[in-house]
């Protein structure tokens, strides 16, 4: 994957 989706880091 070339596109890095900026997903928020949500702790479990």
From Swiss-Prot:
Could you tell me which residues carry Pyrrolidone carboxylic acid? 1
Listed transmembrane segments: none
Q: Which GO terms describe its cellular component?
A: extracellular region
Which is one GO molecular function term here?
Answer: peptidase inhibitor activity
The answer to whether keyword Secreted applies is yes
Could you confirm whether the keyword Iron appears in this record?
no
Q: For this chain's UniProt record, which GO biological process terms are given?
A: regulation of blood pressure
Keyword annotations from UniProtKB, A to Z? Hypotensive agent, Metalloenzyme inhibitor, Metalloprotease inhibitor, Protease inhibitor, Pyrrolidone carboxylic acid, Secreted, Toxin
Tissue-level expression reads: Expressed by the venom gland.
Localisation = Secreted
Q: What does this protein do?
A: This peptide both inhibits the activity of the angiotensin-converting enzyme (ACE) and enhances the action of bradykinin by inhibiting the peptidases that inactivate it. It acts as an indirect hypotensive agent.
The similarity comment for this entry is: Belongs to the bradykinin-potentiating peptide family.
> What is this protein's name?
Bradykinin-potentiating peptide 12a
Q: What's the source species for this entry? A: Bothrops jararaca (Jararaca)
């Amino acid at each position: 994957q070339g596109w890095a989706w900026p997903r928020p880091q949500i702790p479990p």
